[in-house]
From Swiss-Prot:
Residues 136-139 are annotated as: G4. It is found in: Cytoplasm. Residues 19-26 are annotated as: G1. It catalyses: GTP + H2O = GDP + phosphate + H(+). InterPro entries: EF-Tu_GTP-bd, EF-Tu_GTPase, EFTu-like_2, EFTU_2, G_TR_CS, P-loop_NTPase, Small_GTP-bd, T_Tr_GTP-bd_dom. It comes from the Bacteria. Residues 174-176 are annotated as: G5. Keywords: Cytoplasm, Elongation factor, GTP-binding, Hydrolase, Magnesium, Metal-binding, Nucleotide-binding, Protein biosynthesis. This is Elongation factor Tu. Mg(2+) binds at residue 26. The lineage of its organism: Bacteria, Pseudomonadati, Pseudomonadota, Betaproteobacteria, Burkholderiales. GO terms for cellular component: cytosol.
Length: 396
């Protein structure tokens, strides 16, 4: 029975469970929804409902993901849980489910395992900013020293991948006990401690409208007597009539002024994140702007050609390549609205990449693109997507 109606007034935060197979991610997800729905309202979701993750497509890649929501006293959370390891890899690289923070589930009985490490590394590569740890199955460990040892191992592993291991909140508990209604320290109490850690350790994310203005250029028109109009959807920030903006990417950066904002054929004083607008630019010729560039607040973003990336290569079944590729492979990289050719440099220990693999690589583009760490892109060959990636580190 719902306790009162669901209010959307609380700040919204996106989280998800990560960790090794069978360490209890899905059980924990079910336990969180159950305990919090009893306390703050919302819908309890059983293990089976979450485990039967529906298939969805992100950038042509098939991913199984379960979405649940729950709330605490101060926030509303959207939470993703994936059934299989491959789904996590795809989810994190495509950004299908952006996470403001992740709950790393580690079985106290087993300690960190290969996928524990891999999910922490992926979180670092794709820019998940915060990790909280739930040491699950703590009821199965009688030895307090052993628990401490596992906790130390997890902290060391986090620090190794540049997360603040020493300051990371670690909650010990048993998702299974909590799900079964146990009110004890390892049951319901542990879930409430975890909820409190989420509320306090993960800051409220900046809303898109509060960021620095950025709009990918989709189309450019010349309107006689008025000048050049650039259309697109504002990704973040606000642009006001009369403000100076930069055109960034592909060619050298130039400054111009926004002399008008138009939406649905009406003139506005400003456009903001989420709006599909036409922006009138002063003294800019039609041939000065092209699809693939961005309009941005001056100094807020720079064009780059060289970067490292974390990439997932589509399997043959997903419509990807049927054969591996090797060092020096030159596909197109699709950033925001356009393709740019680039050359791939593989790590020394990687001779080739097979369809269905995920890999770290260095990329050199033929033309610079307005770029920052965390930017998503697709890898294409002749117009079809063969991979998805995220910029891990900018080189130049």
């Amino acid at each position: 029975m719902a306790k009162g109606k669901f209010e959307r007034t609380k700040p919204h935060v996106n989280v998800g469970t990560i960790g090794h197979v069978d360490h209890g991610k899905t059980t924990l997800t079910a336990a969180i929804t159950t305990v919090l729905s009893n306390k703050f309202g919302g819908e309890a979701r059983g293990y089976d409902q979450i485990d039967a993750a529906p298939e969805e497509k992100a950038r042509g890649i098939t991913i199984n993901t379960s979405h649940v929501e729950y709330e605490t006293e101060t926030r509303h959370y959207a939470h993703v849980d994936c059934p299989g390891h491959a789904d996590y890899v795809k989810n994190m690289i495509t950004g299908a489910a952006q996470m403001d923070g992740a709950i790393l589930v580690v079985s106290a009985a087993d300690g960190p395992m290969p996928q524990t490490r891999e999910h922490i590394l992926l979180s670092r590569q794709v820019g998940v900013p915060y990790i909280i740890v739930f040491l699950n199955k703590a009821d199965m460990v009688d030895d307090a020293e052993l628990l401490e040892l596992v906790e130390m191992e997890v902290r060391e592993l986090l620090s190794k991948y540049d997360f603040p291991g020493d300051d990371t909140p670690i909650v010990k508990g048993s998702a299974k006990l909590a799900l079964e209604g146990d009110k004890g320290e390892l049951g319901e109490q542990a879930i409430l401690s975890l909820a409190q850690a989420l509320d306090t350790y993960i800051p409220t994310p900046e809303r898109a409208v509060d960021g620095a203005f950025l709009m990918p250029v989709e189309d450019v028109f010349s309107i006689s007597g008025r000048g050049t109009v650039v259309t697109g959807r504002i990704e973040r920030g606000v642009v006001k009539v009369g403000e100076e903006i930069e055109i960034v990417g592909i060619k050298p950066t130039v400054k111009t002024t926004c002399t008008g904002v138009e939406m649905f054929r009406k003139l506005l004083d400003q456009g903001q994140a989420g709006d599909n607008v036409g922006i009138l630019l002063r003294g800019t010729k039609r041939e000065d702007v092209e699809r693939g560039q961005v309009l941005a607040k001056p100094g807020s973003i720079n064009p780059h050609t060289d970067f490292t990336a974390e990439v997932y290569i589509l399997s043959k079944e997903e419509g990807g390549r049927h054969t591996p590729f090797f060092n020096g492979y030159r596909p197109q990289f699709y950033f925001r609205t356009t393709d740019v050719t680039g050359t791939i440099d593989l790590p020394a220990d990687k001779e080739m990449v097979l369809p269905g693999d995920n890999v770290s690589m260095t990329v050199k583009l033929l033309a610079p693109i307005a770029m920052e760490e965390g930017l998503r892109f697709a890898i294409r060959e002749g117009g079809r997507t063969v991979g998805a990636g995220v910029v891990a580190k900018i080189i130049k």
